[in-house]
Amino acid sequence: MNIRLMFTLIALLVLTVSFSGANSCFKRNRQCKGSFLKSACCEGLKCVNGRCT
């Protein structure tokens, strides 16, 4: 029973992380912080002066 519960919790955690990761990029003109967060802006956009361009 405990093993099954643990497996369910791990599965939920993995789903949550993968789902939030898919929607974590910022679209054009969204605020962003610094160039070290390369994944902050969506693909093809860069963080310039605090905005994704």
Curated annotation (Swiss-Prot):
Expression sites by tissue: Expressed by the venom gland.
An annotated Gene Ontology molecular function: toxin activity
Main location: secreted
Entry keyword set: Disulfide bond, Knottin, Neurotoxin, Secreted, Signal, Toxin
Disulphides: 25-42, 32-47, 41-52
Keyword Phosphoprotein: no
Record comment regarding domains: The presence of a 'disulfide through disulfide knot' structurally defines this protein as a knottin.
UniProt function note: May have neurotoxic activity.
UniProt protein name: U1-poneritoxin-Dq5a
Upper classification of the organism: Eukaryota, Metazoa, Ecdysozoa, Arthropoda, Hexapoda
